Amino acid sequence: MKQIIFKTIAVALLATTGYQTVAAQQQVANNRRERILQVLDQSRPNAYVPAAFFLHFENKLGRKAVQDHKDFYRATNMDFVKVFYEISVPQIDIKSGKDWEKVPVYSEEFFAPQVAVIEDLAREFGKEAFILPTVYSPLALAHQTIGRGKDLRKLAEENPVAFGKAIKNLSLSIENYLRSARKHGADGFYVSSQGGDGNSLSTKIWQEQVRQWDKHVSEVANEIGEINILHICDYGTPFKNAEALYAFADYPASIINVPLNFSDGSSLNLKEAQQRFGRPIFGGLERLGVIANGTIEEAKKAVDKVLENAAPNFILGADCTVPGETDWEKLRAVIDYAHNWRLTHNK
């Protein structure tokens, strides 16, 4: 209860304070869609640095979830509305590889509770900011299907063909979600890709059974969406190096959200990544770093380092979702700082 009261107070306070004047705030709010589109034009640098961070809310679906998204968007001054995906496919008793054949294609109706959240947020903010719902990967839905405590890699290897059919059905299910969300106000999508890190699946199964259906999600999003972010997820399973990351360069997307550190001890060069992908990079900060655990001043110093080494057309954010307890006031301070960074630093 205290946390809820604190966040309510924080929303009220943050709505009346900030780095910019009220007039400037209104100008930014009315042009967030335009400012994101300007970043996509890599023929010229942009003085304004868009920024956004994400965290999961206590309320997952329904009116309270809509309100949580509204409060967070307003309080942090972020540049687009990212809608969390909080619906799970039913668990199926997968005891052997053959049981993957039980996985169906889920219809648009299955995703209706999630789409309702998108529709409400689009009604509220669609004219001022892009509405970008999260899209989980087919592999993530496969994990939901078997539930906790089961070895997905082992079950996939028992019957790769049946597993591949399940992944296909889950990818087609996600396509149904995408098309429904687009009809109800989504401008595009934040598409998560998983499985290509070389850890969660064997390279053979990834290449032969999963990759085309993982990529299919991005292809559908690209077909129907105005703007899309590809999130190359390494949650719990880091990629070996940057070259492994660049294997996703053929995925269609407007913007790329990237991991920062690799299992061989190396780190990502943001300018090189933007050049290799040929699209703006979104990220730069570690989700469990200073943005979660440091002070506002420490976080600003980290932003300095990121933006000094990033390409001119860049969107500041984290490499994945930040912890739910992350201070909203700190996120607001960092976002406001990024917005004006190139002007205040003459870069």
Q: What does each model-identified segment do?
A:
Residues Q25-H56, D79, V83, Y106-K347:
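Active-site loop segments of alpha/beta catalytic cores
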Residues M1-I9:
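Bacterial N-terminal signal peptides that target proteins for export
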Residues I9-A10, N228:
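Terminal low-complexity, poorly structured segments
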Residues I4, T21, Q26-Q27:
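Generic low-complexity segments that are intrinsically disordered, proline-rich and/or Lys/Arg-biased
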Residues L40, R44-V103:
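N-terminal capping/small domains of soluble enzymes
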Residues L14-V22:
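C-terminal segment of classical bacterial N-terminal signal peptides
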